[in-house]
Amino acid sequence: MKVTLPDFERAGVMVVGDVMLDRYWYGPTSRISPEAPVPVVKVETIEERPGGAANVAMNIASLGASSRLVGLTGIDDAARALSQSLAQVNVKCDFVSVPTHPTITKLRVLSRNQQLIRLDFEEGFDGVDPEPLHERINQALGQIGALVLSDYAKGALASVQQMIQLARKAGVPVLIDPKGTDFERYRGATLLTPNLSEFEAVAGKCKTEQDIVERGMKIIADFDLSALLVTRSEQGMTLLQPGKAPFHLPTQAQEVYDVTGAGDTVIGVLAATLASGNSLEEACFFANAAAGVVVGKLGTSTVSPVELENAVRGRAETGFGVMSEAALKEAVLAARKRGEKVVMTNGVFDILHAGHVSYLANARKLGDRLIVAVNSDASTRRLKGDTRPVNPQEQRMIVLAALEAVDWVVPFEEDTPQRLISEILPDLLVKGGDYKPEDIAGSKEVWANGGDVMVLNFEDGCSTTNIIKKIQKNS
């Protein structure tokens, strides 16, 4: 088994399926409405994230592969928001606009980390002419190494059989994350990736490993599949292929925070790895490692090449660098067992300059290990505006991890790192600038745990904003 990452940059993948926009409204609630016995939420933060097939496409793009997305949308603000969000992460969208239907949108209202209600805005696309989708697939088949069909039963894959046959005729593997119990719809696919409950809904309850193997092989034969991958949560995943022994991979998840979107990550990594020229067994190996990373994050997430490389090389256990939250907790625990003092700071670190380097070096001198928590791209946009960050999250983390002063780099999605700090609980929390210690996010949690909080001065004359202005002035 190879442990070097696939050459994702040479991979081209098309995703066809049910695209949707996930909207999140966050805010505090402190009273009950006088109109009805329901809480009143004062909305303070609004987030929009691509969902469904769009999340699969984002997972492929996050690896550095060429990612194309085809689906059905309305002609509305949600469709425009989807296109803009996906363009920012290098997903090439080729939507079919249907003027009679709205773009599928799911709105969630949350307060104090609890979802209060979900509102679905959708109208099934069943009955919509599938020919424009077929045309887009045909045009791309000579330029892609894999086709993913992402089925959420919203109508985009009503003609899934024709799509499978188009790809088979061109010799392009077809990977499908199935929906429902009618696997006949997917006859002739290269690979189906049901989770255990989806598998058992078709095959029946499995009491033993042998039951899974025997019933899985029957499904392969009955529906003319090339392979079947059963994802089994904490039990890992099992690949079944005709004429080959079952290939089982135990889970690599160190700690599970959220399984949202894990299936999208699995099929995205599978497709990108196959399109890179690797075997199906190798694709499962990398997909399993990626799943172990993504469930260690909160919310729907993607996996970067750096995170995937760390996972397959075991750097989370023995080394340093960019890490998931779950891996970082393990590394910090090991450091404390060695009697090391852990220092933590945070920031955007968009364009790294001398002031940053000096500040991080000074922070590192205050302890034995330095953690740098980095705002994700979405978090940075909310904090700094739509023109930021200049450098994407992965590049910012790679540069930080290369600094001698920095031991661990971890991203966070929220507006502040308060939740992350409360999970890590460093011995010393450091922030640069003119903050008061009590105003620093996470300070109360660190103090309550017996730690310290300190403010360090930034080097005069060094500012990312000033650098950007200077570049703009000279361009």
From Swiss-Prot:
Region: Cytidylyltransferase, residue numbers: 344-475
Pfam families: CTP_transf_like, PfkB
Region listing for Ribokinase, in residue ranges: 1-318
Residues annotated as catalytic: D264
InterPro entries tied to this protein: Bifunc_HldE (IPR023030), Carboh/pur_kinase_PfkB_CS (IPR002173), Cyt_trans-like (IPR004821), PfkB_dom (IPR011611), RfaE_dom_I (IPR011913), RfaE_dom_II (IPR011914), Ribokinase-like (IPR029056), Rossmann-like_a/b/a_fold (IPR014729)
EC number: 2.7.1.167, 2.7.7.70
Residues annotated as binding ATP: N195, L196, S197, E198
Recorded GO MF terms: ATP binding; heptose 7-phosphate kinase activity; heptose-1-phosphate adenylyltransferase activity; phosphotransferase activity, alcohol group as acceptor
Gene Ontology cellular component list: cytosol
Reactions it catalyzes: D-glycero-beta-D-manno-heptose 7-phosphate + ATP = D-glycero-beta-D-manno-heptose 1,7-bisphosphate + ADP + H(+); D-glycero-beta-D-manno-heptose 1-phosphate + ATP + H(+) = ADP-D-glycero-beta-D-manno-heptose + diphosphate
BP GO terms, sorted: ADP-L-glycero-beta-D-manno-heptose biosynthetic process
Pathway(s) served: Nucleotide-sugar biosynthesis; ADP-L-glycero-beta-D-manno-heptose biosynthesis; ADP-L-glycero-beta-D-manno-heptose from D-glycero-beta-D-manno-heptose 7-phosphate: step 1/4; Nucleotide-sugar biosynthesis; ADP-L-glycero-beta-D-manno-heptose biosynthesis; ADP-L-glycero-beta-D-manno-heptose from D-glycero-beta-D-manno-heptose 7-phosphate: step 3/4
Keywords, alphabetical: ATP-binding, Carbohydrate metabolism, Kinase, Multifunctional enzyme, Nucleotide-binding, Nucleotidyltransferase, Transferase
Family to which the UniProt record says this protein belongs: In the N-terminal section; belongs to the carbohydrate kinase PfkB family.
Subunit structure: Homodimer.
Function: Catalyzes the ADP transfer from ATP to D-glycero-beta-D-manno-heptose 1-phosphate, yielding ADP-D-glycero-beta-D-manno-heptose.
Name of the molecule in the record: Bifunctional protein HldE
Organism lineage: Bacteria, Pseudomonadati, Pseudomonadota, Gammaproteobacteria, Enterobacterales
